[in-house]
A protein has these predicted regions:
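Short, Lys/Arg-enriched N-terminal segments with co-localized hydrophobic residues
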Residues: 13-32
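Pyridoxal 5′-phosphate
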Residues: 26-258
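C-terminal active-site-capping segments
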Residues: 7
Length: 258
C-alpha cells in the first residue's frame, strides 16, 4: 500500500509539472495571439477578461450547489439570480421569464417544441424562413417527420423576410412564427417589430433566434411582441456552453430534460 507521504509527493510532482506545462501553453497562446488578426466574431467571440474574472471564484471558492440550503450554495444562487436579472434588464422583461440553457441550439429546440406541444392542434403548423440557422431548420425537419407542417418563407434580395408574406402564410393551425433577428452569414436584420405586430394580431406565438443580435443591437421584447427569444453567451464575449431562452410572462414551459 502506498504511504500518504508518497501519495502527497506524487501529487506535488504532478502539480509542478502541470504548472510548468500551463505556463508554456499560456506563453505559446500569447505569442500566437500577437500574430493573429481575428475578424470572425460572427462565428464566436473571445470572453472578455472581466468575464473570466467574474467566473473564476465560482470554480474555486463559491462552488456550492445553488439548490442547497447552506451558505456556500446560497452564494452560488445569488450569483445566478443576479445574472438572470441583468439579462432581463437588457430586454426590458421580468426576471422570471429568463431560462438558462447550454446555448442557442437548446434554446431554439425548446421554443419550437414548446409551441408544438402547447398549440393543441391535430397537425400543428410553423412558419419560418429559408435562411434560419440550422438549429431552427434541422428542428423543423425533425418535427415534420412527426407530422408538423412547416412553411419556409423565401427572402428578398436584401435577405429579409417580407412581413406581408408572413401574414399570408399564417393559417388556423399555425402555432408559431420563428424568424431570426439577424442573419449570421449576410448580416441582414429582419423586420421583427412588424412581424411581431402581425403575430400578436393573429394570436400566434412569435419566436426569434436572436443569437446574432443580442448584445450587438438593442432589443425590446415587449415592444416587438416577442414571445420567445434565444441567445447564446459565446456570441457576445461570454463563456461557451451558456445561453438563455426568454419566454413571455404567462407561458408555461415544459422541461425538455426530465
Amino acid at each position: 500500500m502506498i504511504s500518504l507521504e508518497r501519495r502527497l509527493f506524487c501529487l506535488w510532482i504532478f502539480y509542478k509539472y502541470m504548472q510548468r506545462k500551463i505556463g508554456q501553453n499560456r506563453k505559446e497562446w500569447y505569442d500566437y495571439m500577437k500574430r493573429l488578426i481575428y475578424l470572425d466574431h460572427a462565428a464566436t467571440t473571445q470572453p472578455f477578461p472581466e468575464v473570466l474574472d467574474a467566473m473564476i471564484p465560482y470554480y474555486s471558492r463559491y462552488y456550492g450547489n445553488p439548490s442547497s440550503g447552506y451558505e456556500l450554495g446560497e452564494e452560488s444562487k445569488r450569483a445566478i439570480e443576479t445574472a438572470r436579472g441583468q439579462i432581463a434588464d437588457t430586454l426590458g422583461v421580468e426576471d422570471d421569464t429568463i431560462y438558462f440553457t447550454s446555448g442557442g441550439t437548446e434554446s431554439d429546440n425548446w421554443a419550437l417544441r414548446y409551441a408544438v406541444q402547447n398549440g393543441k392542434r391535430r397537425r400543428p403548423h410553423i412558419v419560418t424562413s429559408s435562411i434560419e440557422h440550422h438549429a431552427i431548420l434541422n428542428t423543423c425537419k425533425n418535427l415534420e417527420k412527426q407530422g408538423v407542417r412547416v412553411t419556409y418563407l423565401p427572402v428578398n434580395k436584401e435577405g429579409t423576410v417580407q412581413p406581408e408574406m408572413v401574414e399570408r402564410a399564417i393559417i388556423s393551425d399555425t402555432v408559431l412564427v420563428s424568424v431570426m433577428y439577424a442573419n449570421n452569414e449576410i448580416g441582414s436584420i429582419q423586420p421583427i417589430r412588424q412581424i411581431g405586430q402581425i403575430t400578436h394580431r393573429k394570436q400566434v406565438l412569435f419566436h426569434t433566434d436572436a443569437v446574432q443580435a443580442y448584445g450587438q443591437i438593442p432589443i425590446h421584447a415587449k415592444e416587438d411582441n416577442i414571445d420567445l427569444l434565444s441567445a447564446s453567451g459565446h456570441k457576445f464575449n461570454g463563456p461557451k456552453g451558456t445561453g438563455f431562452l426568454y419566454a413571455r410572462k404567462g407561458l408555461k414551459l415544459q422541461p425538455m430534460i426530465h
